[in-house]
Regions:
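Sequence context surrounding c-type heme c attachment/ligation sites in exported
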Residues: 22-39, 43-50, 68-147
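Positively charged n-region of N-terminal signal peptides that target proteins for export
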Residues: 1-4
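Interfacial loop at the N-terminal end of multi-pass membrane proteins
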Residues: 47-59
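Bacterial N-terminal signal peptides
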Residues: 6-15
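N-terminal post-signal-peptidase region of extra-cytosolic proteins
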Residues: 56-67, 78-79
């Protein structure tokens, strides 16, 4: 039993040391999105327009590929947006598939900034608001994309 506790503690400490616990990076984004631009890009060309919640030109990246019609547990989806007339990201929205989570296993977070020199700040918006909209894409595992 003591060995099990020691192993669990070591794994927890390793998780925190590696940043997997979601610590904010220097730009204000959580560490779990580090290197998202090297992940698989879901859309072939940038997505223009969209809802007021996610206006601008967007790109969507996934950390893991779909298995059949669903993304596996541990998948992270990152959507970035650049506002019209600007050349810097103003929005980074995330979806993380977590075992046992509601809404198909997805958790949502959104980060914004109003200038290229600012750090991103997390929006305090209820996750249920994201889920209500993403429910429209339930047949695509809650992920909106246009290829």
């Amino acid at each position: 039993m003591t060995r099990y506790i020691a192993l669990a503690l070591a794994a927890t400490l390793a998780c925190f040391a590696s940043g997997a616990a979601g610590r904010p990076a220097k730009d204000g984004l959580p560490s779990y999105v580090d290197s998202y631009s090297a992940w698989t890009k879901v859309n072939r060309k940038p997505i223009a327009g969209g809802s007021p919640a996610h206006a601008g030109t967007k790109n969507v990246y996934v950390s893991k590929r779909q298995r059949g019609t669903r993304y596996p547990v541990g998948t992270i989806v990152v959507k970035t947006a650049t506002q019209p007339g600007r050349r810097w990201l103003s929005l980074v929205a995330t979806m993380r598939r977590i075992k046992g989570a509601a809404n198909g296993g997805w958790r949502w977070e959104e980060f914004t900034r109003s200038s290229s020199s600012q750090r991103f700040s997390k929006i305090d918006f209820p996750e249920s608001g994201c889920a209500a909209c993403h429910m429209q894409a339930k047949s695509n595992d809650y992920v909106f994309t246009r290829r």
